[in-house]
C-alpha cells in the first residue's frame, strides 16, 4: 500500500514539474511572439529615428540582383497605356492578367529568378508585381531601401491570402517604392516556424511622379509624447497644372499655330510617417473624397463619372460609369452590394451636389434615390426665388453614411445640417431628423419639427427646474444654449450605440457659413444622438486651425488626423492639444485619411 502511495506521489510530482515546464515554455514563446510583434510595429512606423541603419548598407554590391525595365538586359515586364482612361478599362486589365498568367505557366519561377513586372496594371506607380514559388509553405517580409540618409526604410509583411499567411506560391505587390530613385528591395522568406529561410536583394530604378507629387513633404515634429500611429496617409488633393504646347491647324490657308494647353493631373497619394511618397494612384481629371475596401478590392473615383474596383495586385476588376451623373463628394457602401454616391445630374440647369444615386455592383445599374430639391422643397424654392435661377448651389451635400436598412445620414454644408433620411428604396423618402441650429429652420414650420433639441447632458438634467414664480421674482433669464451647433460641417462618421435609438456622430465643424459666430477656429465634434428622446448632446469638442472649405478629421483612441484644407497641411495630434507631426503640402488637400491596409496589401 505504501509503495502504491509512493508511486502516486512521484507521478504527481513529475506531472506538476512537466506541466510547469510546459507553462514556462508557453509563456516564454508568448513573450517572444509579443516582442516580435512590437518590433515589427516599430519597424513599420517608417521613422528614421526608430531604425538602426538602412537595409541596403548590410548588402554586398555583388549580391544585388539588378532589375531592368528596358534595354538588352530587360528582365521586368512593362505595360504601356495610351491614357489614364485606358488604365481603368477592365478589359485591358484582364488582358494584362492573362498575359502574366501565360508567362507564369510557361516557366518555373523561384526567388532568384522571380517574375517581376513594374506597375503592370497602371494603378500604382510606386509598386512592383512579383511572383515566385518556394519548396515549402512560407511567408515573405520585404524592405524597400534607398541610398538617401533622409528617407527611412519601408518594411511590410506581404499578404498571401492563404491559411496562416503560409503558401508555396507567392504573388504580391511590393509597395512603398520611392519615385525617381534606385530602389533596393530585400525579400526575406520565413518558414512555418518563423525561421528565416532565404534572403535576396534586388535593385530597380523607379520613374518620377507623373502627377508632379512631392517626393518628400516638409514635416514638423511636435511636442507630443504620444507614439505616432502606424499606417499610410491617404491624400486626396487638388491636381497639379502642366503646360504643353500643341500645333493647331486653322483658317482657309490651314496655317499651323502653336497653342498653349494647361491641364491638371490628379492622383490619390500615399505618404508614410516621415512624409515620403509611397504610393501614387492615378485618376482621370478628378480626385474624389474617399476610398472604400469592398470585399477584396479597393473602390475609388477613377474619374468624375466613374468608380473603379481594384484588387490587391492592382488589377482593375470593374469600372462603373455613373450614367447621367457626375460625382460631387463622398460615396459609401451599404454592405449588401449597393454603393450610394453624392452626385450632380449632367443636365444644364441641374442643382449641384443635390442628388444621391445608387450604384448596384451586381449589374452596374444607376438609380437616383434622393433628390434634395424635392426632399427639402420649401428650402429649395426659397433659394431659387432669392437667386433667381433654378440651378442655385443651395444644399451642398458633401458627406454620406448608411445608418440602417434604407436609411442614410447626409451632410448638407450650405444648410449647416445633418439630415437622417429613411425609406430610401421607396418613391417618397422621408426625413427622420435634422441636426442644425434651430434658428435656421424657423421659416419652415414642418421642417422645424424635425430639428432635434440640444441636451446639456445628465448633470444638467439633474438640476432642479425653477418655477415660473421664482423665475419672475429673480427675473432669471432663459437658460443659454448648452453648446453651439455645427456650421459648414464636413466628413461625417456614424456609429450605432448598443442602446436602441442612440448613436455617435463625429464630424469636422468648419465653423463657417450663414448664422455662424465666427472665431477663426474649426472644431472636432462628437455628438450623442438619442432619437427616442429627440435630442443630441455635444460629448467631445477639440479646437483646430480653421478651414472653411473641404478638410476632415478622423479620430483614433490616442490620436487624430486632421486635414486643414485652407492651410494646405495635415497633422496627426493627440487629445491634449499637442502635435505629434505636421505635414505641409504645396496644393490644397480635400481629405486625408490614415489606413494601415492590413488584410489588403499587408499581413
Residue ranges and their predicted role:
Residues 26-51, 55:
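Ser/Thr/Pro/Gly-rich low-complexity linker/stalk segments immediately outside membranes or between
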Residues 1-15:
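N-terminal Sec-pathway targeting helices
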Residues 49, 67-71, 160-164, 400, ...:
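Compositionally biased, low-complexity repeat tracts
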Residues 49-84:
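Long lumenal/extracellular ectodomains of secretory and single-pass membrane proteins
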Residues 71-140, 144, 168-171, 178-182, ...:
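Histidine-/acidic-rich catalytic cores in large beta-rich domains
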Amino acid at each position: 500500500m505504501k509503495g502504491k502511495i509512493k508511486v502516486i506521489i512521484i507521478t504527481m510530482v513529475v506531472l506538476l514539474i512537466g506541466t510547469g515546464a510546459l507553462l514556462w515554455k508557453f509563456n516564454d514563446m508568448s513573450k517572444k511572439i509579443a516582442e516580435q510583434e512590437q518590433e515589427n510595429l516599430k519597424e513599420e512606423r517608417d521613422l528614421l529615428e526608430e531604425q538602426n541603419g538602412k537595409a541596403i548598407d548590410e548588402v554586398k554590391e555583388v549580391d544585388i540582383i539588378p532589375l531592368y525595365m528596358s534595354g538588352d538586359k530587360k528582365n521586368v515586364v512593362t505595360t504601356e497605356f495610351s491614357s489614364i482612361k485606358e488604365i481603368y478599362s477592365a478589359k485591358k486589365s484582364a488582358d494584362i492578367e492573362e498575359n502574366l498568367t501565360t508567362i507564369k505557366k510557361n516557366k518555373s519561377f523561384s526567388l532568384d529568378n522571380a517574375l517581376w513586372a513594374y506597375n503592370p496594371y497602371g494603378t500604382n506607380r510606386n509598386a512592383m508585381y512579383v511572383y515566385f514559388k518556394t519548396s515549402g509553405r512560407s511567408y515573405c517580409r520585404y524592405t524597400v531601401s534607398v541610398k538617401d540618409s533622409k528617407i527611412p526604410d519601408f518594411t511590410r509583411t506581404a499578404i498571401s491570402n492563404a491559411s496562416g499567411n503560409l503558401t508555396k506560391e507567392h504573388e504580391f505587390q511590393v509597395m512603398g517604392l520611392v519615385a525617381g530613385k534606385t530602389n533596393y528591395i530585400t525579400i526575406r522568406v520565413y518558414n512555418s516556424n518563423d525561421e528565416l529561410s532565404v534572403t535576396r536583394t534586388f535593385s530597380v530604378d523607379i520613374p518620377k511622379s507623373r502627377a508632379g507629387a512631392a517626393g518628400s513633404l516638409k514635416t514638423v515634429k511636435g511636442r507630443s509624447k504620444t507614439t505616432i500611429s502606424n499606417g499610410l496617409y491617404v491624400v486626396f488633393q487638388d491636381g497639379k497644372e502642366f503646360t504643353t504646347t500643341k500645333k493647331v491647324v486653322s483658317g482657309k490657308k490651314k496655317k499651323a499655330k502653336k497653342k498653349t494647353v494647361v491641364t491638371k493631373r490628379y492622383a490619390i497619394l500615399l505618404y508614410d510617417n516621415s512624409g515620403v511618397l509611397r504610393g501614387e494612384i492615378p485618376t482621370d481629371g478628378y480626385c474624389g473624397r474617399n476610398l472604400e475596401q469592398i470585399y477584396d478590392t479597393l473602390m475609388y473615383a477613377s474619374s468624375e463619372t466613374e468608380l473603379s474596383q481594384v484588387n490587391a495586385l492592382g488589377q482593375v476588376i470593374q469600372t462603373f460609369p455613373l450614367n447621367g451623373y457626375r460625382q460631387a463628394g463622398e460615396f459609401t457602401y451599404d454592405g449588401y452590394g449597393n454603393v450610394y454616391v453624392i452626385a450632380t445630374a449632367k443636365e444644364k440647369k441641374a442643382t449641384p451636389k443635390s442628388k444621391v444615386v445608387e450604384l448596384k455592383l451586381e449589374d452596374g445599374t444607376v438609380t437616383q434615390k434622393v433628390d434634395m430639391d424635392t426632399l427639402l422643397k420649401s428650402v429649395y424654392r426659397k433659394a431659387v426665388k432669392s437667386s433667381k435661377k433654378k440651378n442655385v448651389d443651395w444644399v451642398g451635400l458633401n458627406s454620406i453614411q448608411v445608418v440602417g436598412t434604407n436609411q442614410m445620414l447626409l451632410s448638407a454644408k450650405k444648410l449647416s445640417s445633418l439630415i437622417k433620411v429613411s425609406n430610401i428604396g421607396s418613391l417618397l423618402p422621408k426625413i427622420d431628423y435634422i441636426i442644425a441650429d434651430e434658428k435656421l429652420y424657423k421659416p419652415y414650420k414642418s421642417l422645424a419639427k424635425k430639428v432635434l433639441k440640444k441636451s446639456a447632458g445628465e448633470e444638467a438634467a439633474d438640476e432642479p427646474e425653477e418655477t415660473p414664480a421664482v423665475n419672475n421674482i429673480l427675473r432669471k433669464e432663459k437658460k443659454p444654449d448648452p453648446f453651439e451647433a455645427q456650421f459648414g460641417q464636413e466628413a461625417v462618421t456614424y456609429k450605432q450605440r448598443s442602446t436602441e435609438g442612440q448613436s455617435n456622430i463625429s464630424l469636422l465643424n468648419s465653423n463657417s457659413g450663414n448664422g455662424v459666430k465666427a472665431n477663426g477656429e474649426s472644431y472636432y465634434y462628437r455628438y450623442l444622438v438619442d432619437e427616442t428622446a429627440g435630442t443630441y448632446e455635444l460629448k467631445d469638442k477639440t479646437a483646430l486651425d480653421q478651414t472653411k472649405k473641404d478638410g476632415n478629421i478622423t479620430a483614433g483612441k490616442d490620436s487624430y488626423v486632421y486635414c486643414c484644407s485652407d492651410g494646405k497641411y495635415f497633422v496627426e495630434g493627440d487629445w491634449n492639444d499637442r502635435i505629434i507631426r505636421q505635414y505641409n503640402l504645396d496644393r490644397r488637400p480635400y481629405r486625408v485619411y490614415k489606413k494601415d491596409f492590413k488584410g489588403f496589401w499587408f499581413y
